[in-house]
Amino acid sequence: MTSPIPAIPVSGGAVRSPRGPIYLLGRRLGSGAFGAVFDCLGPFDQSFALKVFLPGNRPYEEVRAEWLKEAERLYRLRHPNIVYVHDYFEAAGLFYLVLERCDHSLDEMLQAPFTDRLVVDMARQLLFAVQYLADNEFVHNDLHAGNVLVVQGERLTAKLSDLGIAQELYGYGGAKPSIVQHRLMSPEVAAGGYSTKQSDLYQLGLLIYQMHTGVYPIDTTVGYDGIIAQIRDGVPRAKAEALGTPIGDIVSVMLRRQEQYRYTSALQVWEDLQKLDVWSRDRVERTAEIPVFEPLPPTQNG
C-alpha cells in the first residue's frame, strides 16, 4: 500500500517549523512540478517567500535529497547577490525553504531593452555573485532571467536563486551536468562535455544580451536540433558582434565557442564593463563623494 501524496498548503494556512517558528501563508507566488512558492509572514511578522517541495510521483528520498542540497548550498553561500535562506525544515511529508522575499524576477522586466546604465549595473551584481560561486568552486548551470530575483529600492538589487543543479568542482576543471536547459547550453555542454566556470560566463552572456536588446540570442522555437545547431555555429556570438555596441562587444567575448577564448573570470568581464562611459562617469562622481580623512597630528604627552 502506497502512502498518500501530501497536499500543498493553501493560502491563509500556517506551517510550523520543528524549530518552533510558525509561518503564515499568504498568496501563492508561483508553482511548478517541484511544488509552490508562497508569500509568508514569520514569527515577528517578517516578510519571507516560502518554497514548498512536493514529492508528487517521484521517490521521497530523491526529492528530499534535492531539497536538502539546495538548502545547504544557500545556507553556506552567503552573498549580497544570492538569495538568503533563513530556515529550512521538513514537516508532514513536505520540504520547506524560508527564503528572503524579493519583489519579482528579472524575467518580468524583459519586455523591452534596458538602458545601458541598467544593463551594466545588473551585470555587475550578477558577475559579483558568479565570481563568488567560482571562488567557492561552484558552477551554477542555470543562469537565466527566471532565476534572477530583484529587490526594489533606491537602486535595483539582483539576486541569484535556485542552486538546485549547481555543481561543486572540488578542484577539478569541470563537472558533467545532470541537466541543463537546451537554450542555456554552452558549446562545450552541447557537445556532450563538462560545465566549467566559463560555462557560467556563457550563460550570463546570453542573459546580458537579452537585457541589452530585449530579445534572446537563440531562436528557441526550432526544436532541440535547431537550438544545438545555433550554439554549435556560434550564432549568439555573431549576433552580439553585429550589434556594434560597446556592451555587445564585451558580450561577444563571453559567448565565444571555445572556452579558452572567453574571459577567464567574472571579474575580468567586469573590468571591461566598468570602463564603459555609461558607468565610468558615474564611478568618478561617486568616488569624488567619498570623504577624505586626514590623520590627526601626533600629540605630546604631559
Show which residues each predicted segment covers.
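Protein kinase glycine-rich loop
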Residues: 26-32, 37
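Conserved beta3-strand ATP-binding lysine motif
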Residues: 51-56
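AlphaC helix of the eukaryotic protein kinase fold
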Residues: 57-76
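Activation-segment/catalytic-loop signature of the eukaryotic protein kinase fold
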Residues: 88
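Conserved short submotifs of the Hanks-type protein kinase catalytic core
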Residues: 92-105
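Activation segment signature within eukaryotic-like protein kinase domains
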Residues: 122-123
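Protein kinase catalytic-loop region centered on the HRD/HxD motif
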Residues: 128-138
